[in-house]
């Protein structure tokens, strides 16, 4: 068996007073395709940065096979020092790296190389960073959320490119289909530890649930054993002194073990404010046409959306998905055609831009608005700590300033704030960006149980397949087609 390329052994790391890792392990083998999964804030990105040598650890050992090359894709690439995307990509080449791949990668990722970083979109910045990371064909390729801001065509191209590489590839992603198509092994980062599944991600969730159930059973057995020993201390201390001293010491050890176990934070339990029912139809578009300058976005498109439907909208970046959404909502008028809106609509829009919040607010203040300890969900008053727990926040995070939250935690906060308000039309514009897999599970349940109409714009194939009943898909040349079901 070939030796590993990189290992992390017994890694410990603490931020402030909170331990992030307590004995984390990672092994990268030749021809590896490993996915790293875990909840937001569990330390996935930090573990990847430790492996890349970008973050120091407090204790433990990092070993890298001499002479290997590594490349790391950051979540937020910085192109501010470069005049063009090509200049940024070429700057990533070193030594014997050959620049022949750059035109191929630019073409595959729909870039010209002449893009100005100052005006590039999030998707263009991400594609440029991918090209820079992929260009050298490194021995180890580390990708942190590579599908964020990519459209479906770019995601599928990236899957095929990764499959063609001989590099060992480590992936952090919330895109289930992407992980299922690429991973060979799965590393779960959970409460400071790492657990390895020697199988593809498609087996992970069943394995995780069984592991947590067994852990719950083991903890219950430990609690019962402590109870029996405590009973002995009260009623049965007699006989040989040495035996008694040892048994008392064992009881102390059991208590410490029980106390220091980090329990699972549970599952999301999303509460949605009640609202009045909308009319029978939500929005009707009749033969609409829309252009921006010389670019025609829609040409003779019609659809009628009725109450209770789950509508998905898919298409390449720049094809007009958000414009279509705004036309459906009556926020943008078509150049030709007719738009009719239903009655009694109460829309709730959760979009990829994230609402602007005061970063100095605490999490509690952002949820209560008035700084009290109650959250108003429709007409119901819920204690802020309970409401936080429903969205996987810990009670001790109540006083955490918003600037200290991760991208995924801010996404959960946006959901928590939005769902306080009554609505009967839920609009999700790229809702899966930055959310962890558990949050996506519950967002899917929310869409399924929502007592109203849902419209989703997304590049997440698995999310669409699990949630929508009809899909509006971009075909080509301003033509859009309606299909039953998901992607």
Q: Model regions: which residues?
A:
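Alpha-helical coupling/stalk and coiled-coil linker elements that connect catalytic or binding modules
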Residues: 229-238, 252-253, 268-275, 282-284
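Intracellular alpha-helical coupling/juxtamembrane segments of multi-pass membrane proteins
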Residues: 207-240, 244-248, 254-261
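ABC ATP-binding cassette signature C-motif
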Residues: 1-219, 270-487
């Amino acid at each position: 068996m070939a030796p590993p390329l990189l290992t992390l052994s017994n890694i410990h790391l603490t931020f402030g007073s909170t331990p992030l890792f307590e004995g984390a392990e990672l092994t990268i083998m030749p021809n590896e395709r490993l996915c790293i999964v875990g909840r937001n804030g569990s330390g996935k990105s930090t573990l990847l940065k430790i492996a890349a040598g970008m973050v120091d650890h407090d204790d433990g050992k990092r070993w890298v096979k001499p002479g290997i090359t590594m490349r790391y894709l950051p979540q937020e690439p910085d192109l501010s020092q470069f005049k063009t995307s090509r200049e940024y990509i070429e700057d990533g080449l070193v030594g014997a790296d050959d620049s022949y791949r750059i035109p191929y990668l630019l073409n595959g990722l729909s870039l010209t190389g002449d893009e100005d970083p100052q005006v590039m979109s999030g998707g263009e910045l991400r594609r440029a960073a991918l090209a820079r990371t992929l260009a050298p064909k490194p021995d180890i390729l580390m990708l942190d959320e590579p599908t964020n801001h990519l459209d479906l065509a770019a995601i599928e191209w990236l899957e095929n490119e990764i499959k063609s590489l001989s590099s060992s590839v480590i992936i952090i992603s919330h895109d289930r289909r992407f992980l299922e198509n690429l991973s060979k092994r799965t590393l779960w980062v959970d409460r400071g530890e790492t657990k390895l599944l020697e199988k593809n991600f498609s087996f992970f969730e069943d394995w995780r649930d069984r592991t947590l159930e067994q852990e719950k059973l083991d903890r219950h057995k430990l609690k019962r054993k402590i109870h029996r020993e405590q009973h002995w201390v009260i009623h049965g201390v007699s006989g040989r002194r040495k035996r008694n001293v040892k048994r008392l010491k064992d009881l102390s050890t059991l208590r410490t073990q029980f106390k220091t176990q980090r329990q699972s934070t549970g599952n999301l339990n999303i509460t949605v404010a009640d609202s009045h029912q909308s009319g029978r139809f939500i929005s009707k578009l009749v033969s609409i046409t829309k252009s921006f300058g010389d670019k025609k976005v829609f040409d003779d498109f019609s659809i009628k959306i009725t109450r209770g439907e789950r509508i998905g909208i898919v298409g390449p970046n720049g094809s007009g998905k958000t414009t279509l959404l705004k036309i459906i909502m009556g926020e943008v008028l078509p150049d030709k055609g007719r738009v009719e809106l239903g009655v009694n609509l109460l829309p709730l829009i959760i979009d990829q831009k994230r609402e602007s919040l005061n970063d100095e607010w605490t999490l509690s203040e952002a949820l209560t608005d008035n700084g009290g300890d109650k959250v108003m969900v429709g007409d119901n008053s819920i204690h802020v700590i309970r409401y936080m727990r429903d969205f996987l926040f810990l009670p001790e995070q109540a006083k955490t300033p918003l600037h200290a939250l991760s991208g995924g935690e801010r996404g959960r906060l946006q959901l928590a704030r939005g769902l306080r308000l009554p609505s009967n039309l839920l609009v999700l514009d790229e809702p899966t960006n930055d959310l962890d897999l558990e949050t996506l599970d519950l967002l899917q349940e929310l869409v399924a149980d929502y007592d109203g109409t849902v419209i989703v714009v997304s590049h997440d194939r698995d999310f669409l397949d699990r949630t929508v009943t009809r899909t509006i898909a971009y075909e080509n040349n301003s033509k859009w087609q309606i299909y039953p079901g998901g992607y």
